């Protein structure tokens, strides 16, 4: 924000020297005497007139109703600005859900807006009403320093928010790993330090750099911005350039969000088609409890390989094998949810040398090398149980310890129609991974080993259902992530739009004043400068409109419902704790 030197100048008094048009001979005095007296009288009369004008009219030439209207309007806006930004700061303090990295930037922006509401708005209103600066040169320089540092910090914070949103969407893996609160604090600190270094020293000490103060008494503006060309240059650096950068970044954010929305829609459609198969083999033939032979395809070993790792917690009551239950598990896709079990998925990259042991308690681990991420996204059919791949390195024998004894591996099922045992032994041909340097078929066949692991039809069915559940979880996580990104983008768009609307009129006048310094009335300068302040009033409204958490927290604070909210939160946590203990089996604790 650039305060133009003509925006609040005291009225000029032309034609003061018109009474001195007579020649020296008419006055009967020497030329030098008349000139000296005339000069003295002109300056004395001018000074007395100005002094009498300013001291006798503290309202600056305004009527009482004009003063009341200006004071009421600006005072109301200042009060709303102060209350709104205090609400943002307090909401960030009391609500842990708001303590995200993105909201740290909004907190910094709220602090800058609060400074403007407390100091800048009120002093500038006094300056407008009195039509002169009556607080002295030091107070003038301090006000301008605080005003410009806070305003520039707001712009810098908007730039930081824009870049943060842009990198979060375009580089989600690399940038978000480094996106911590500590790093956010460093960026916020840099924004404030840069703003302070750019404006405060120049405003406070420029008169000492040039050797004199050129700002007239009763006026308050930045001395080095008295030239329109310099004023326009600062407007380019402080407004036009940041707005251009933020607009470009927001456009890129919008395009990337639309692209990810389309990808998510395709992923959801793919998942729906896969679930519609209801675990029927692609050939159309139903499967019984016969044995399957699952053979792993030979793959090259890479330095790091990703596995889908799942952990199951089974209670004893949910594991009663019978023919009816086998049929029910085979035909119904909801039986997975009916079991008293919980599953958690984590995607982790493990090195080839990492040894993963299997649990021999009620909790046991199954490590399946599921299809790659890209294939999950692009394919519409999940692989059948024949195509399930098992890693020989990470999948050992699966041991399940029941209450009194361990389940023993059983032989393959015979010609009977019904399943009589819990598990059947399924031969699995496992091929150890081949080193990247060995590409010939001879070397590959030499490294192959064969192992037999206990695996039943029910295990294959559960694995397939887990694959579907995994896909559903991936889709859900992507959908939730996209929703959060859209909310953050909406908040950014609202803040950016408010910034452009409130700051553009004044900076357009700065551009016009460069070519025509008398084309813009003083009243327009005052309105344009005050409109820049209104941006600090609008920002908290943007947070509330675009963020439900901010909105509910504001409502809670305004209605003094903090205690009720804490009680509800404690009750919710207690209920969740009870549900968690019910789900986790006692032997797993």
Curated annotation (Swiss-Prot):
A motif (Basolateral sorting signal) lies at residues 274-280. Coiled coil: none annotated. Changing residue 533 to F: Decreased affinity for acetylcholine. GO terms for cellular component: asymmetric synapse; axon terminus; basal plasma membrane; basolateral plasma membrane; dendrite; endoplasmic reticulum membrane; glutamatergic synapse; plasma membrane. SUPFAM superfamilies: Family A G protein-coupled receptor-like (SSF81321). Residues 91-103, 164-183, 252-490, 546-589 are cytoplasmic. It comes from the Eukaryota. The keyword Plastid does not apply. This is Muscarinic acetylcholine receptor M3.
């Amino acid at each position: 924000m650039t305060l133009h030197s003509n925006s609040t100048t005291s009225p000029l008094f032309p034609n003061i020297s018109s009474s001195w048009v007579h020649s020296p001979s008419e006055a009967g005095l020497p030329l030098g005497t008349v000139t000296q007296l005339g000069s003295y009288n002109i300056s004395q009369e001018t000074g007395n007139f100005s002094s009498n004008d300013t001291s006798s009219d503290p309202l600056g030439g305004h009527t009482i109703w004009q003063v009341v209207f200006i004071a009421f309007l600006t005072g109301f806006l200042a009060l709303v600005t102060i209350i709104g930004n205090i609400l943002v700061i307090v909401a960030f303090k009391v609500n842990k859900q708001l303590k995200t990295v993105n909201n740290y930037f909004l907190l910094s922006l709220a602090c800058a807006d609060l400074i403007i509401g407390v100091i800048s708005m009120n002093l500038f209103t006094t300056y407008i009403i009195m039509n002169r600066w009556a607080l002295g040169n030091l107070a003038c320089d301090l006000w301008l320093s605080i005003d410009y540092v806070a305003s520039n910090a707001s712009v810098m914070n908007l730039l930081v928010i824009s870049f943060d949103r842009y990198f979060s969407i375009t580089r989600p893996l690399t940038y978000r790993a480094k996106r911590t609160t500590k790093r956010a604090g460093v960026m916020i600190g840099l924004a404030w330090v840069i703003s302070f270094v750019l404006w405060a020293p120049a405003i406070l000490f420029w008169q000492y750099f040039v050797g004199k103060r050129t700002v007239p008494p009763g006026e308050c503006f930045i001395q080095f911005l008295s030239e329109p060309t310099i004023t326009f240059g600062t407007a380019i650096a402080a407004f036009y350039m940041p707005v251009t950068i933020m607009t470009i970044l927001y456009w890129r954010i919008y395009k990337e969000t639309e692209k990810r929305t389309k990808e998510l829609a395709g992923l959801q459609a793919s998942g729906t088609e896969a679930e519609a198969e209801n675990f029927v083999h692609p050939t159309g033939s139903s499967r019984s409890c016969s044995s399957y032979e699952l053979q792993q395809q030979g793959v090259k070993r890479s330095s790091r390989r990703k596995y889908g790792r799942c952990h199951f917690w089974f209670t004893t009551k949910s594991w009663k094998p019978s023919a009816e239950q086998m049929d029910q598990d085979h035909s119904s896709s909801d039986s997975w949810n009916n079991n008293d079990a919980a599953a958690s998925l984590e995607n982790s990259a493990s090195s080839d040398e990492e040894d993963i042991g299997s649990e021999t308690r009620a909790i046991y681990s199954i490590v399946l090398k599921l299809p790659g991420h890209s294939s999950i996204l692009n394919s519409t059919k999940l692989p059948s149980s024949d195509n399930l791949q098992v890693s020989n390195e990470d999948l050992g024998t699966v041991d399940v310890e029941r209450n009194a004894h361990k389940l023993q591996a059983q032989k393959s099922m015979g010609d009977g129609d019904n399943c009589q045992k819990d598990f059947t032994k399924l031969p699995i041909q496992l091929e150890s991974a081949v080193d990247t340097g060995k590409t010939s078929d001879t070397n590959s066949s030499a490294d192959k080993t064969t192992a037999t692991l206990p695996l039943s039809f029910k295990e294959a069915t559960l694995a397939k259902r887990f694959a579907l559940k995994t896909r559903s979880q991936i889709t859900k996580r992507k959908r939730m992530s996209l929703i959060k990104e859209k909310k953050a983008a909406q908040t950014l768009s609202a803040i950016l739009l408010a910034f452009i609307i409130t700051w553009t009129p004044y900076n357009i006048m700065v551009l016009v004043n460069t070519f025509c310094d008398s084309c813009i009335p003083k009243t327009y300068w005052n309105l344009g400068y005050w409109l820049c302040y209104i941006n600090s009033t609008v920002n908290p409204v943007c947070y509330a409109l675009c963020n439900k958490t901010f909105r509910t927290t504001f409502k809670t604070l305004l209605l003094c419902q903090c205690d009720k909210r804490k009680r509800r939160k404690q009750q919710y946590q207690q209920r969740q704790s009870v549900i968690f203990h019910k789900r986790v089996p006692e032997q797993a604790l």
